């Protein structure tokens, strides 16, 4: 039998090598799952399948994992390195496979008991052939296939094949916690079976809905029936017209997911990413897979940089063994032919505004709740639109409000919000963003626009997807809003806790996105060049500054989740110079090499700098304070930072709590001393004039933010009775003038939303009394602090502009 089995395996290898291309999840199981290669590994497969076993062997060889067909030799005992949990329907099946598996587990457990240094790792492995969940009116497509069935299946699903390595189970841990349990081997097998069942569901998801049946159910819901009746009361309306309008709205909104479309999309997108980018880097996907296995309802909330985000995240999730979500897409993307295609890939469409339209808002809310009820993962962009500046935008809370309301209605599964950072070394629409910021009208999406974008397709560097720390909503609400389960409502019938909870969760999502940013060659090199007033440095200066930033990010991490490039500073610079349309130019003269950023590309580069600006504003602020004083105490530095930090925190969604700032500033100071940028003499921090150029470059990261704050504070001192709206308008006018006169490239410098955030933070920080009047003394104190950190030229321009504004207002 053994010889026949070996011949059978050899015969199988030929069609496998020709027809099957397997993707490993995760791509690096040794590091991502923390496998210990110096300890024995036992692979557990769910069903007897020689095909799956050979696929496992091939992938183990590629991933530097032990060969499953080579036995483990432990203490002179040779045991199989793989086991099957169940027989299945097979030609070459192991008689009594289940009892054989338990026997192998018993023998491994005995070996572990006899050697305290031994820690055998049991690794569940499953091979997926196709991921279709099936339709509600049909049979599940993903079946447990027999040997000959799989040979046929190779032709159809050979390129849609995944192998999933799961977290290892430590037999040492099992013995420590259940050492005297005689049924431990049976328990281990039973737990593994349950794991595989959950894993299959997490990979395929619930059955796809029958669209018309879903519509019929929703149209009979009490909330929608009430909204239809309300609509029918309007002039020139009737119950029949209102119902037809409701059906039309549902058809406009609802997705129409088809698995064959998702498979086609996978092939198209694989081609697209290979053509567009040199690689897509994914981090922290395991935390999401864990939540899916635990049965959580997943709501993906990414930042929004590009229309590519819709496609990229679904593609990444599919390749991470997760179900692509239903995606809330703007109605502007519902144009032919893209609309029907996106709809078949999971997009459901939302109007930009539907305030006052009760019928539409009710139908949309009920549709979203139905998606949650059926167990579909959902994705929406909380910023509401694509960021034109590269910064996170203030969250639009409508979708989050509907999510929390759906949870309160009594979902059986817990909901977890998954913040996602998406970044690119080149955003396709960045040129368009620059034009829009200069006043051009936004071009409406259409097929012609898509074709023009496709023409630009070429190597655009790297893409980045980092999954931030999830927010389990049930746990979060229990901790911070324990009244959320109570049926208390306000005068509008909304839960009293809802608005505060929605605001808090939304801001927490933004903080978690920024906690998981990806530093890359382009945003780092761009940040250094933009720090120089002339946007140019010698190659040596630039390399030195990049290395300084990298040391700072490693030794004083913003969070443990921020990902850093692994290349040297030299390699990063060469990479950016060679990127198409990066604007970074290398020139040589008699004295050496100069790296400069051309003028036209400066505004575009600020977009990429803004992706990571929050990482270096506190080091920049510390550098600015030390440069201003030249010799300064630690307490004065911390006191100054504490005064300014609330404004930075509100604008950049920074995670440090007030009590955590001091420790972080002390770590920054210690790092600056270690890098010899400053000296610590008799408890005073002193600038090191030999490294002053590097310290000046560090200080520039916060320069434009302080200039904006100075504008608003100066206006408040001159006009303490000014309204908040007028303060924002006048601040913006002066910022525009400052931008022109001083060549400030940052597109967000005169963004109205940032001045609005600043004035709101002034109110939160007690710069106005209960009547709303300005507390001038507090404003003056902060203005004096900030004035010392910006140049005299900027001060003069601001004061001159204020005089001009006053003259205009008096006319």
Swiss-Prot record:
Pathway: Phospholipid metabolism; CDP-diacylglycerol biosynthesis; CDP-diacylglycerol from sn-glycerol 3-phosphate: step 1/3. Keywords: Acyltransferase, Cell inner membrane, Cell membrane, Lipid biosynthesis, Lipid metabolism, Membrane, Phospholipid biosynthesis, Phospholipid metabolism, Transferase. It is a peripheral membrane protein. GO terms for cellular component: plasma membrane. Coiled coil: none annotated. It catalyses: sn-glycerol 3-phosphate + an acyl-CoA = a 1-acyl-sn-glycero-3-phosphate + CoA. One of its GO terms (molecular function) is glycerol-3-phosphate O-acyltransferase activity. InterPro entries: GPAT/DHAPAT, GPAT/DHAPAT_C, GPAT/DHAPAT_LPLAT, GPAT_PlsB, Plipid/glycerol_acylTrfase. It is found in: Cell inner membrane. Belongs to the GPAT/DAPAT family. The HXXXXD motif is essential for acyltransferase activity and may constitute the binding site for the phosphate moiety of the glycerol-3-phosphate. This is Glycerol-3-phosphate acyltransferase. It comes from Glaesserella parasuis serovar 5 (strain SH0165). The gene is plsB.
């Amino acid at each position: 039998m053994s010889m026949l089995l070996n011949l059978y395996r050899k015969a199988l290898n030929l069609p496998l090598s020709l027809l099957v291309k397997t993707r490993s999840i995760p791509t690096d199981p040794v590091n991502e799952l923390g496998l210990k290669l110096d300890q024995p590994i036992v692979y557990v497969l769910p069903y007897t399948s020689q095909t799956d076993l050979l696929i496992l062997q091939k992938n183990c060889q590629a991933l530097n994992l032990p060969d499953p067909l080579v036995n483990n030799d432990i203490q002179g005992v040779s045991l199989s390195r793989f086991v099957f949990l169940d027989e299945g329907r097979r030609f070459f099946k192991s008689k009594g496979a289940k009892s054989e598996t338990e026997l192998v587990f018993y023998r491994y457990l005995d070996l572990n008991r006899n050697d305290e240094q031994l820690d055998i790792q049991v690794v569940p492995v499953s091979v997926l052939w196709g991921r279709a969940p099936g339709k509600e009116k049909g049979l599940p497509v993903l079946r447990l296939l027999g040997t000959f069935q799989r040979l046929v299946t190779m032709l159809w699903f050979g390129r849609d094949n995944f192998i999933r390595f799961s977290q290892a189970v430590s037999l040492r841990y099992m013995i420590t916690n259940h050492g005297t349990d005689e049924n431990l081997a049976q328990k281990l097998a039973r737990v593994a079976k349950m794991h595989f069942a959950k894993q299959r569901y997490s990979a395929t998801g619930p059955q796809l809905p029958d669209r018309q049946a879903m519509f019929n159910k929703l149209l009979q819901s009490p909330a929608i029936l009430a909204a239809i009746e309300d609509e029918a009361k309007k002039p020139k309306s009737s119950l029949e017209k209102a119902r037809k309008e409701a059906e039309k709205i549902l058809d406009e909104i609802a997705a129409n997911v088809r698995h064959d479309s998702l498979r086609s999309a996978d092939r198209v997108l694989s081609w697209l990413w290979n053509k567009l980018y040199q690689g897509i880097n994914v981090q922290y996907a395991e935390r999401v897979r864990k939540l899916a296995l635990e049965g959580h309802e997943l709501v993906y909330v990414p930042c929004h940089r590009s229309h590519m985000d819709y496609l990229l995240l679904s593609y990444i999730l599919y390749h991470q063994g997760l179900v692509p979500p239903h995606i809330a897409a703007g109605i502007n993307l519902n144009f032919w032919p893209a609309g029907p295609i996106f709809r078949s890939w999971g997009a459901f469409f939302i109007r930009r505004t539907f305030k006052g339209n009760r019928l539409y808002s009710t139908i949309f809310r009920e549709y979203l709740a139905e998606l949650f009820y059926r167990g579909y993962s959902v994705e929406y962009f909380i910023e509401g639109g694509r960021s034109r500046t590269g910064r996170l935008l203030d969250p639009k809370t409508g979708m989050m409000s509907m999510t929390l309301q759906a949870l309160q209605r009594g979902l059986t599964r817990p909901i977890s919000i998954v913040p996602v950072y998406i970044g690119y070394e080149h955003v396709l629409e960045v040129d368009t963003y620059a034009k829009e910021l200069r006043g051009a009208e936004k071009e409406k999406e259409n097929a012609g626009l898509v074709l023009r974008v496709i023409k630009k397709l070429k190597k655009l560097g790297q893409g980045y997807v980092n999954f931030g720390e999830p927010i389990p909503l049930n746990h979060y609400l229990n901790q911070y809003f324990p009244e959320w389960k109570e049926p208390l409502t306000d005068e509008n019938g909304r839960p009293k806790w809802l608005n505060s909870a929605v605001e808090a969760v939304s801001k927490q999502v933004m903080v978690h996105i920024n906690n998981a940013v990806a530093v890359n060659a382009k945003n780092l090199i761009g940040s250094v060049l933009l720090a120089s007033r002339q946007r140019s440095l010698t190659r040596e200066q630039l390399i030195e500054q990049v290395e300084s930033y990298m040391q700072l990010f490693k030794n004083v991490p913003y969070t443990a989740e921020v990902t850093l490039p692994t290349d040297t500073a030299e390699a990063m610079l060469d990479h950016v110079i060679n990127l198409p349309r990066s604007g970074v130019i290398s020139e040589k003269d008699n004295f050496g090499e100069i790296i400069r950023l051309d003028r036209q590309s400066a505004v575009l580069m600020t977009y990429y700098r803004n992706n990571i600006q929050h990482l270096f504003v506190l080091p920049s602020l510390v550098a600015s304070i030390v440069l201003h004083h030249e010799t300064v105490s630690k307490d004065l530095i911390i006191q100054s930072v504490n005064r300014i930090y609330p404004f930075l925190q509100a604008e950049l969604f920074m995670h440090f709590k007030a009590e955590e700032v001091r420790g972080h500033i002390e770590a920054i100071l210690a790092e600056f001393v270690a890098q010899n940028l400053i000296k610590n003499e008799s408890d005073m921090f002193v600038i090191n004039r030999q490294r002053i150029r590097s310290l000046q470059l560090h200080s520039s990261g916060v320069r434009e933010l302080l200039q904006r704050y100075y504008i608003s504070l100066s206006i408040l001192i001159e006009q303490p009775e000014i309204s908040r709206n007028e303060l924002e308008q006048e601040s913006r006018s002066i910022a525009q003038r400052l931008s022109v006169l001083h060549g400030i490239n940052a597109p967000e410098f005169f963004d109205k939303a940032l001045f609005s955030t600043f004035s709101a933070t002034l109110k939160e920080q007690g710069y106005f009394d209960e009547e709303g009047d300005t507390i001038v003394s507090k404003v003056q104190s902060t203005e004096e602090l900030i004035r010392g950190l910006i140049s005299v030229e900027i001060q003069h321009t601001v004061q001159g502009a204020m005089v001009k504004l006053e003259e205009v207002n008096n006319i």
